[in-house]
Amino acid sequence: MPLPDFHVSEPFTLGIELEMQVVNPPGYDLSQDSSMLIDAVKNKITAGEVKHDITESMLELATDVCRDINQAAGQFSAMQKVVLQAATDHHLEICGGGTHPFQKWQRQEVCDNERYQRTLENFGYLIQQATVFGQHVHVGCASGDDAIYLLHGLSRFVPHFIALSAASPYMQGTDTRFASSRPNIFSAFPDNGPMPWVSNWQQFEALFRCLSYTTMIDSIKDLHWDIRPSPHFGTVEVRVMDTPLTLSHAVNMAGLIQATAHWLLTERPFKHQEKDYLLYKFNRFQACRYGLEGVITDPHTGDRRPLTEDTLRLLEKIAPSAHKIGASSAIEALHRQVVSGLNEAQLMRDFVADGGSLIGLVKKHCEIWAGD
């Protein structure tokens, strides 16, 4: 399928997707009932969309195009009420978090969807293992060239986005020692990590043509890059965050990305070059492994900086942009999080260290989601 022309969208508009866990009490393992929930709510959603993701234990909540985080929060809140009621009616519960702490990937059923079934044929068991849960944020762009500039600019802050959203320390019943273990699941995919270097939209079109020769790529949705352009929507999509435990944190993360995008496209503070990516995977690993306690390295100077310190510097830089687009509350909340040194991964570990079980942890996450 050829790459569509880049759809011009209003700059800095938002679209947010949350991949949620559908669980079965009282054992709190993943359920295989997302199709039933989607059927139950499809005529009750007035804004946004509730839809399938890869496997039957995943439920995606997606906003419409939103002007700001307040509009997105309102849509999510309304969807949440409908979904929670449907889950209660079917004796199910819903929660966030980047991974389910003890599910077995072998039990996961891929959705009866042509695209997902084709992906299963291409990638085999890797698709079942990809039963993990992330937050994706789309930001509108006026042109394809703007999208490429924005993608490279946001890529500098992938470690910051991962560390602030880290919520997947447990997997397959084990403490992984990672703050965010979810991104590791995609390491075997041939398109894992950053997009190959291009400097403008024309070069991206050539890159996509080359990738399509593999016969594994039918559309941009078949590419699993950390950040990717979405020409159909006219956006850049950031895909590195774990699904937070609360709607409020999800909205704050979206506000961070929207404000960073505004700063990048308004100020144009960087002259991007391929060398920017030399240490990309090392810095990304630091964020996944250690969260905000990680250390990132500048590929041009060799300077090493604590991720906490660099995140505070980013929040300070983008504060004026956040004010202009109505995202100041998000930046202030994230600033408090960084200063406190807490993230959701550490709170999960604290719960278990205090004697809680992994079953109890999922139950608590369901209570947090329902009470947010």
From Swiss-Prot:
SUPFAM superfamilies: Glutamine synthetase/guanido kinase (SSF55931). InterPro entries: GCL_type2/YbdK_subfam (IPR050141), GCS2 (IPR006336), Gln_synth/guanido_kin_cat_dom (IPR014746), YbdK (IPR011793). The keyword Nucleotide-binding applies. It comes from the Bacteria. One of its GO terms (biological process) is modified amino acid biosynthetic process. Signal peptide: none annotated. Keywords: ATP-binding, Ligase, Nucleotide-binding. GO terms for molecular function: ATP binding; glutamate-cysteine ligase activity; ligase activity, forming carbon-nitrogen bonds; protein homodimerization activity. Its EC number is 6.3.2.2. Pfam families: GCS2 (PF04107). It catalyses: L-cysteine + L-glutamate + ATP = gamma-L-glutamyl-L-cysteine + ADP + phosphate + H(+). Catalytic activity was tested towards all 20 common amino acids, but was only observed with L-cysteine. HAMAP family: Glu_cys_ligase_2 (MF_01609). Belongs to the glutamate--cysteine ligase type 2 family. YbdK subfamily. NCBIfam families: gshA_cyan_rel, PRK13516.1. Homodimer. ATP-dependent carboxylate-amine ligase which exhibits weak glutamate--cysteine ligase activity. However, because of the low catalytic rate, the question remains whether L-cysteine is the actual biological substrate. This is Putative glutamate--cysteine ligase 2. It comes from Escherichia coli (strain K12).
